[in-house]
């Protein structure tokens, strides 16, 4: 999302799952925008590190603001549209999403140590999401 499209403000310009993951990872990291990694660490069975992704982060907004958003998103999981995420037994901040015509559903949520994002689409007759 580059902000050059005026429809972005209105919510009409689609975000990729990567965009959403980056934004929520920044919230989970108290306003520090981290470098995203599909695999952060690989260890042997005895705990020897084989790979550690390089880490870096850029402070993009104040930690207090990120914490306020996290508190609101925790309410979504506790009392809102994402209550099934409570089954993990952990405090989770997150948001569910659906399309108006019920052809897509998504959830993105985080704890202080993990973020998960899922998006599913029901394809049309041509196989397009």
Summary of predicted features, one role per range:
Residues 1-19:
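Primarily short, surface-exposed interaction patches in extracytoplasmic proteins
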Residues 14-129:
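A penicillin-recognizing enzyme superfamily signal
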């Amino acid at each position: 999302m580059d902000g050059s499209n005026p429809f972005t403000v209105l919510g009409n310009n689609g975000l990729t799952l990567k965009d959403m993951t980056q934004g929520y990872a920044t919230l989970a990291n108290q306003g520090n925008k981290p470098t995203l990694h599909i695999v952060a660490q690989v260890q042997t069975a005895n705990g020897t590190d084989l790979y550690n992704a390089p880490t870096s982060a850029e402070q993009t907004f104040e930690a207090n603001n990120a914490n306020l958003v996290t508190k609101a998103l925790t309410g979504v999981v506790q009392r809102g549209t994402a209550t099934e995420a409570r089954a993990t037994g952990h405090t989770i901040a997150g948001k569910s999403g659906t399309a108006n015509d019920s052809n897509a559903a998504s959830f993105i949520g985080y704890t202080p140590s993990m973020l998960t994002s899922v998006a599913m689409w029901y394809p049309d007759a041509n196989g397009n999401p």
